[in-house]
């Protein structure tokens, strides 16, 4: 039987909810990068992040502010960046984000990048 090495990164919010969603996203990604690199060094083959990992968990509410946090898959900022890390480390990365599938249509989803 083959062995599969998996990793999970979960952390608290780097900033606060009064900040703009793009600023929160940038801080969260910056905080994840060292752990992505560590996972790559340790030979992780499948790396997962927590739900809506670039933002606070706002999903139970209806605050329109968070619409600005939505990104496209596969062409959004976070997905494109994670494609680079997946390629660099030859790993699959599960990228849970708030997706804008089309104007006005939003999903709490995950892109799977290999």
Mark where each language-model region is:
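Hydrophobic structural segments
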Residues: 1-114
């Amino acid at each position: 039987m083959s062995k599969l090495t998996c990793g999970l990164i979960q952390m608290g919010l780097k900033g606060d909810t009064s900040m703009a969603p793009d600023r929160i996203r940038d801080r969260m990604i910056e905080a994840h990068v060292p752990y992505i690199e560590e996972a790559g060094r340790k030979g992780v083959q499948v790396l997962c992040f927590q739900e809506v990992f670039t933002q606070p968990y706002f999903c139970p509410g209806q605050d329109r502010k968070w619409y600005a946090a939505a990104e496209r898959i596969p062409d959004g900022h976070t997905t494109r960046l994670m494609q680079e890390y997946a390629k660099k480390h030859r790993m699959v990365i599960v990228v849970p984000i708030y997706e804008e599938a089309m104007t006005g249509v939003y999903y709490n989803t995950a892109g799977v990048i290999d």
